[in-house]
Amino acid sequence: MQYKTVIFDLDGTLLNTLDDLAGATNYALTQHGLPARTKDEVRWFVGNGIRKLIKRAVPAEASAELQEQVYATFNTYYKAHCNDKTKAYDGIMELLAALRKAGCRTAIVSNKADYGVQELVKQYFAGQMDAACGEREGIAKKPAPEMLFAVMEKLGAEKNATIYIGDSDTDIETARNAGIPCIGACWGFRGRDFLVQHGAKLLAENPQEVWKLLQD
């Protein structure tokens, strides 16, 4: 296998977190007298961090102060409810097991708040990730490549032996900015057509296809 380090996005790639993200978003909105959003709307709001999620979810006329209040409420609620309905996508655990058996290092780079990343890694991927990096102060979030670079440096990974897997245009752009290839996860929050429109060169309909692509 050419790739010795396989780095994954989290939301919409390893885990289906949409129900919990939508639940926390709507809890935060309604606590401040704002209208709730549909799950499909939230699906398109996620991917660029919680602040951007909240900015997209609140009405356009909402003040910066109100946005900040909704953001704080979201964080408090989501910390306690980030794993109420979340689950791994079918085939993910088998893919990770196969990669580990093949001697690959596996890691996560996500724009999800780091507290959520670490909690979900502990719940789902204990002993299966060599590194996990979520959004936090002091490091630029995706599509800037710094988070990928930080994980690669920690693992001693070389660019020509590293690949990123994600379900969004942000993931494609992040990999491009880092100078590594990307596999688009068509089972995630965006879908095949969207990924193709945003420049995906490698696409997988399911985790089993990821494994096949990694063998080529």
Spans of model-derived segments:
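Glycine-rich phosphate-binding loop signature in dinucleotide/nucleotide-binding domains
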Residues: M1, K101-C104, L155-A161
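Substrate-recognition "cap/lid" segment bordering the active-site pocket of phosphatases
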Residues: D84-K87, A113-I165, D169-A178, R192-F194
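Metal-dependent phosphoesterase signature
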Residues: K55-E94, A102
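Substrate-recognition element of Asp-dependent hydrolases with the DxDx(T/V) motif
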Residues: I92-K122
